[in-house]
Structures are given as structure tokens and as C-alpha cells.
Amino acid sequence: MSKSLKRVTRALTEAGLDCLIQEIGHATTAQMAADLVGCEIDQIAKSIIFAGSDTGTAILFITAGGAQVDPACASALAGEPLGKADAALIRTQTGFAIGGVSPVGHLSAPRAYFDRRLLAFDQIWAAAGTPRHVFGAPPGEVLRVSGAELADFTV
């Protein structure tokens, strides 16, 4: 088991969540992940990381799989212009590789925002620390454990 997967598993357990973690193979899109899990695309919780242009810190947006983050809304929420986060920043600040960024278990907890549309489902699926693993949990629990703020930031 990878260090990242162990860290996510530990974070979920410490939060009192008994989640099913599945190895689904390498999915490069939310639609591929949804097809492999057998759920709707919007039940896939994507963890999108931006870099604060002023602070240089990672800022996490947890969004429904079929949605796109609106850069203007995201910047307004963050209170600073946002830019693309490169692989080095993501790995250094979250501890995850691109494609495996989980909403929980970060090395350093980023500011995080949670897409309201995820609350429409009984269960959502999110990366579990690797591009090949996901965990399923009620969206309210993912919101709680992630420490994210509920917000509107998608188009």
C-alpha cells in the first residue's frame, strides 16, 4: 500500500468513517472513473488544486465530476488571483501526485471549497491518494472531514 493511500485511509479512520476503498485502475477523466465505479459523473468528487498567485499556496476545490471550476468565482473565494498549480507544488503541499489528490489526508491542509451540487447524492466517490484508488462516502461526511467551506464556484 502506498504512503498516500495509507495517509488517506488513516485520515478517514481517524474521522470515524468506515469507507469502502476500491482499486479501479487508472482513470484519467471523471467520466472514466464514474464508468469504472458504476455511478453518475457528478458523483465523482474531483479535487482541483490551484496556486494562489499572491501566497503561492495550494487551494483545493472539490467539485462534481461534470462541472468545471469558474476561475473568476474561485479567485473571488480565495481572495487572490489563482494560477495553475504545477506538479511540484501539488506534491509538496498535499503529498499527492496529480490524478490522486484526495479531499482528505493532505500533508498540510489547504484552504478548501466544496461544490454544493455534490450534496445532491447519497454517496460520492473521491480519489484515495493514488490515481488508481477511490473511496465512497456520504458527501456531508466528505465535506466535514475535508474541512472545506461549502461554496458556489462552478460553471
Q: Language-model features: where?
A:
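Extended, low-hydrophobicity, polar/charged segments
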Residues: M1-V155
